Structure formats: structure tokens, C-alpha cells
């Protein structure tokens, strides 16, 4: 049995009621601390929950995917695989590029992970090819995380090579130095270089080979130490003209002598200033450009990082020529700010609605002012605690405060209503405040700690979802705690000073009409309650049916992971036939760009073609479509995507895959669509057998759309089958063959030009304009042991074959990723189940393993823990209530209200067409804390009436229900109106907020109607059970 403080003393509130000045100053201190905290808090879209992620890129121009895999990726993977704290390692080896993405455990600091990566790269250095142009480069960035800012650099007067050179040295480097920036990439590939295009016929006629030319260039351009002269009186540094800086100097280079006459490089090659890689290109809208993508470090604050870039840009662009134009095409922070602003507006709207409902019930301005002060004070004070906890102002913390509006006002309402009741009975305001606050103090404590108990399981959610909602749960808990403090200190003090019999009795036409309305409602409720109490078993059956119905709804409701947000940016992947060349792909890309830019919702477009570590193959292109602001377009992002895909379907020979960018990025690779499923095997042959079979099955499933795979094994290969015996007789080694082919077709970087500001490359290749395709192989010549020139065709046959365009690994084993979207009439849960069922029908061998990735894997994990999360919340609340009430039975009575909330929430979600996602589940957990307030207020007063007035249990619960009907209705409507702005949200980020509001409004409506009748019935049934149990024990003791 609980022990209440004497009602005459005021309990813990007495000190604050009797010392109004001290109480006022204490509240002013909380207010000032909150205001200062608000100004100091950073702003972000969501809490920072990124996995520590590092990307390692190695470029080896001319190398095939299998060479990149065996010579570069595999040695690095073996070293990385030994690092502690590594969660997942994925890699992609394509023509000339190896990209390894390392994702670490959430608990590992990024700086520690960086040190381990650097050590592993150092250990693998001796295992990598000796002719790598550059060592592996790592960046603290998640490649799947969309850039925080995209800039396009264009010029109508300067070549792109000069533009990129200036942008790289004057702009990109400076932006890279900004705190929070993880990587700045320049897409477009127009880095300056001297290109040497050999005329195969010319060097063959002179008896030379490409290797002769390469050796001559390499030896003629050096930059090394030469020493100095140190005499008796002065020192002299040695220097020489060992560097060649321009294409003209290289043209004059003598590569050999024949019959005493020099042969210059210009005689056998076209030497020109050009781009280091001619198979790269980027466009902004329809104009060729250098596209600068800025990505943040995992964990960096996106708003402050973007603000720093914006502040620096004017200074950086001033250093560029006037003909060079820098345009910000996308800035993710624009939508983040808009989303946060909309959420703040909804918070203010919730406060206004709650104050309005208070006035409607209390019909008294002084009585309305008191909770009108308590609510913002509790919310503002929360900001001070958020600063100390390193939180940010984001959508989730603002949602927590919006929901808290309905929570925090409850405490003030309960206190005011109880004090007002004593004043209306004729007691002085001070005595009424002491008596009312002392009487209600235990109820406030019960409400507060039982509600916080519901939030405790959220803090123990695992992985990234737990990190995501940690700020939400703690922010809400802090607001509730501050509210309890304010309600037990400031609220009764203000009641003692502001309320009086005259003010409470003073009525106008509105107050008289509303009073009569409430009296009629209470009278009707009393009549209905009396009838219900006469039919307890029928009422109990209704309560049990809600439990059964909630289970059924839980089973059948569509389930998802996280709402798809409209952030105004669409990422796209364009794919053409596997044999497509760079020129062919660039042409197709421009056709698609023309179609996309015609859409009225599209503001700008950037696209990129080529292989440079971000794009895996020549037959694919990356696109970023920037939409107009939400208030300037008619359709949401999903409708725009559907419209664009329909339009692009008319372009022959290409497939376009689109997905909206999201604030929450869990994946470690850029995917074609939203969700991923992987097949992993011990060999590529196993994948080549089973991937097509599974793809065929999945493409037939109605639960999936846009099904695609990164498995591309039909890339054209010209296999050079060398007769080793013939080659050996001529003194030609396989290294000679590889060198000759690399010199001709690999855009080989053979020398470096050093300047004061940068370094540039000399690129060697054959001029294949007159001998396109496989015919170019007939021009290859090698040097035999006797100095003669031997055609490649004399020792080798060319065989056409197929090979993968890229080779992907997951944790060092071959893997392919199947990407898919979910149609509008299905949920992610439906899609996951359909894939699992299809997998079972294939009877995959034991060496093939499957796994969902990214958000789909997180969905499975969250779904699996949801039931346990709700059970944990219920158990935690039972324990807290049991301790507070010193009873095993009363907590069960209180918890019997929960199924009604679940039924209401699930029905509302289904009617609204929303999925049961993580946000909606959080709403249901919060409902568990809200709806039990009704039962607590009823049971507290019923127990007090039984103990102090000697009422029977039936009379006590009946009177408690009538007495507490108005505050119950008031607090429920306050919580409902606090969630209503979220449910009706239409602005930026509304997709994230709406499921929480829908679930809470639906749950509150249904639970309010049902629990007013089921709770008193269950209270009486458990009272009978307790009496029966006691009598049984008593008989046993007598018999003993």
C-alpha cells in the first residue's frame, strides 16, 4: 500500500509555494539556460549515427578487372581483413580502378579506424604492382552517402583541362581543408597532361617499337637531386634542364638515330596538350563541366560544414578568371533547414492547440496562463540539457518536443484541476494549493516515472536504429522530467497567487455554455458507466477482443523500415549494353539528359560517364537530378521518378534506375535502387550459374519492381593467346607482350612533369583513329633478341571472349548485388518475404550464401526486435508501477489499457495507407506511456477513496471515474492535439513525421473511448480476484 504525504502540508511542493520569489528566479534560470542552449545547438537532419567508414581507391589505368582484383584488391583485402573492429568490407574492381569500402563498428572512433587503415596500406605496399602510378588513397567518407553540395564549373573561353587545373589547385584543395569535409571529387576527368599518340605504321617502318619510345621519354624527363658545390667562400646548388614542360618540347625529343639522322618524337607521334584520361566526361545540364562533389566525413555536422563552404566560396571564386563560372547546383542543407523549420512551426502549432484546449476546459484566463507558462518552460529548459549531451536540433528531437507538448501539459493540468476543485469548494487559494499539490504529488510522480520507463527500452535498441532514437528518447524523457519539476514547483505556486474563487466563478456566455455541455457529457458518461459496471463480463470480452484484434492487425499491416523522404534530389544510374564504348555512352547520356531536363519538376542535372572509382564501367553513367523546391512543383519525388522513368523508356538501348536521396544512409555502395540483396560465393563460376536463375525468378514477383543486378559478365574481351614456344625462340617474354599492349592501349602514364603548383603526366598510347577495333592489334610490334621487329600476330592469336566488367567482393569473397524497389501497393515486408520464399524454391548449394544489405538488413533487424522492444517497455512499466503502488495487481489493471491504443494506432495507419515502420513503432511505444495515464488517475483516486472515506470498491471507482473524467479528457485531447500537427504535416520532411502523428492520434481516440469503461470493470474484477485469493490463503492457514 502506498504512503501519500499529508495533504495539508503540500508535500514536496510546500517549500516552493511558500517562497514565490525563489521559485520564480529558479524558473527564470531554467528559461535562460534553455535559450542559451538553443542558440548553441547545431542543426542537422537526423542524429549523427553514421558508421565509421573509410574508402580506399587505387587507380591502375589500363588494367582489366581480373588484374585489378588479383594484383591490387586482393592484397589490400588480406591486410584490411586483419583489422579489429571491422564490421564489413566490400570492394569493386573494374577496368583501371579498385575501390574498397571499410565499414567499422559504431563504437570504434573514426580516427582509430584511420590509423589502422594506414597501417594496413603500408603493410600491403610491397605486394602491389611496382608500376602503380600512385599508391592507394583513402578517404574518411561513405561512398553511398550523397554529396552535401554539388558545384558545376564551366567556361566558355577556356578548355576544360585548364579549368580543372585551376579548380583543383585553387578551390578543391581549400574546400578539402574545411572541418567536416571528407572528400572532394572532381568528375569530368579533364586533368591536364601531355598525350603522345604513336603512329604504329611510322614506328614500324623505322624498325622501332613503342617500348623504345617509352624508354626514351622516361629517360629524357627526370627530376632528381644533383647535389651542390661547397667552396671556401661560397656554396653553389646544381641544376639542369632535365625537365620538359610542354608538348612542343616533347615533339623535339630525339628518340633514336637512323643512318646518322635523328628521329624526333614528333616524326612518329602526335604530341598535344590534352586530358590525362580521355574516357571521362561530366556535364551540368547540357554543358560540359567539371562537377565538384563535396562529401562529409561520417559523423560531421552537415549544416556547419555546408555553411563553412558557402562562406569560403566567394573568396575562392574571386581567384578564378571571369570566364570561369562556379554554380551551386545542389545543397542538401536547403531541404534540411526547410524540414527543421517546418517541424519547429508544427511544435509552435502544437503548443498553441494545447493552450487552446486548456482554455476550453478551464474557461478561465489565469488558469490557462499557468500551463501556458509551464509548457514552453519545460520544452525550452530541455535545450540546456541537450547541449550537455552533445545533441542537435534535428527532425527527431523536434518531433520528441512536439509530442512532449501533450505530455508536459498533463502534469500541469492535473495539478491545476485538483487545486481549482478545492478553491471552488471555498478554501483559500494558498490552502487549496498546499492541499491539492500534496494530494496529487504521488500521482505526478507515478505518471512521470511510468512514462519514462516506457522510453528506457529505446535506449537499448541495437545497432544504428538504437543510435538513431537515443536522442529522441532522452530528449522526450528530459522534457517530461522538467515538466514534473515545474508542475510540483511553479504550477502550485502560481495557482496560489493567481487563482481565486472570484476568478474561477466568474463566467461569461461561453463558459456557461461549455459548463453545461461538460455537465451533460459527464452525466451521460456516468449513466453509461453504471450500465457497463452491471455487465462486467461483456466489457471484459470487449477488452480481450481488442487484444486479439491488435495481434491480428500487427500480423497483417504492411511493414516498412523508414519513410521515403522527399529531399528534392534524385540519384540515377544509366545502363547501356555491356559492350558500349565511352563515346557511345556519352551520346546516350546526352539523349537521356535532354529528356529529363524537359520535366517541369527538374531544376538541374549533373551527369558523369567513365571509370574513375565512382563509376564501375564504361556502359554506365551516374546522374544527379536536382528538383525544384517543394512549393514550386506539383508532385512529390516518387511521382516525379515514375514520370521520368516513363519518359526515358522511349530512349532506345538504355535502362534508367532512379532513387530519391535519403538523410539516413546505411549502405556502403551506390546502388541502383533503394534496397539490396546479395549472393555470395566462393567463385565467380558459381555466381554465373545462379545469378541469372534468381534474377529470372525475382523479376516475375509482383512485390518487386526495377529489379537489376550488378552482375555483368558479357563484356567483350580480346584474348591474346601467345604461343610461348615461338615467343621464347625469338627472345620475347610475356612481360614484353604486356608492355607493348599497355603502351598502345592503356593510356599509360609513363612520366611526370613537376611544376611549382602541381604535377602532370605524360600519357602514351597508339593513335587508333585509322585502325579502330581489333584491327589495331595488328599494328603491335615487339623487339626480338637479335634486335629485329616482330609483329604480334606472328606469335599470338586473338580470340574474342566474354568477361565481367567488374568484380565485386564482400568480405573477400565474390558477390553480386541485386537491387530492387517496392511497388506502391506492396510493403518492404512483403518484398523481403517474397525474396526469402523464392530463394527456398531454388535450393541453392551450400557454397552460395544470401543476405540482405543496407536498409533492408536494418529493417529485418528492427522488425525482429520490435516485439521484444514493446514487451520490454510493458515489463519496465509494470516494474515501476508495482514499486510505486506496492502491488502486483494494480499495475495489471493500468496496463490493461494498452491493447486499445495498439488497435487504434494500427487501424489509423492502415486507413491512412501508411506502413508500420520504425517511426510508427516509436509512436506505439509512446502510446503505451500515454494511455495508462487515464488508469493511473482513476485508480489513484479510487484507492484514496477506499482508504480515507471507507467507500466500497465499486463506489470508489465509480466516483473516481466521474471526478477524473474532465482531467482525463483534457490530458488526452492535449496529447492528441500535440500529435495532430505531425499527422497533418505537408511540408519538407513530412514523410518522416506523419506516421508518428497518425499512429498517436488513432491510438488516443480509440483508447480514450474504450478505457473510460474497461478500466473500472477490470479494476473491480481484479479486486474480486484479490479478495478470493486472500480468503483461500486464510482457509489454508486455518486448516493448517
UniProtKB/Swiss-Prot annotation:
Q: Which GO terms describe its cellular component?
A: plasma membrane
Family under the similarity heading: Belongs to the resistance-nodulation-cell division (RND) (TC 2.A.6) family. MdtB subfamily.
Gene Ontology molecular-function annotations? xenobiotic transmembrane transporter activity
Residue ranges annotated as transmembrane are 16-36, 347-367, 369-389, 396-416, 440-460, 472-492, 537-557, 863-883, 888-908, 911-931, 968-988, 998-1018
Answer whether the UniProt record assigns the keyword Manganese to this protein: no
Q: Which InterPro entries match?
A: AcrB_DN_DC_subdom, Acrflvin-R, Multidrug-R_MdtB
Q: Which NCBIfam families match?
A: PRK10503.1 (NF007798), RND_permease_2 (NF033617)
Query: What is the stated purpose of this protein?
Result: The MdtABC tripartite complex confers resistance against novobiocin and deoxycholate.
Q: How the protein assembles, per its UniProt entry?
A: Part of a tripartite efflux system composed of MdtA, MdtB and MdtC. MdtB forms a heteromultimer with MdtC.
Q: SUPFAM superfamilies from the xrefs?
A: Multidrug efflux transporter AcrB pore domain, PN1, PN2, PC1 and PC2 subdomains (SSF82693), Multidrug efflux transporter AcrB TolC docking domain, DN and DC subdomains (SSF82714), Multidrug efflux transporter AcrB transmembrane domain (SSF82866)
- Note the topology in the membrane: Multi-pass membrane protein
Please identify the protein, giving its name as recorded.
Multidrug resistance protein MdtB
Where does this protein chiefly localize? membrane
State the compartments where it is located.
Cell inner membrane
Q: What HAMAP family would the database entry show?
A: MdtB (MF_01423)
Which domain of life does the UniProt lineage start with?
Answer: Bacteria
- Which conditions up-regulate this protein? The mdtABC operon is transcriptionally activated by BaeR.
Q: Which Pfam families match?
A: ACR_tran
List the keywords (alphabetical): Cell inner membrane, Cell membrane, Membrane, Transmembrane, Transmembrane helix, Transport
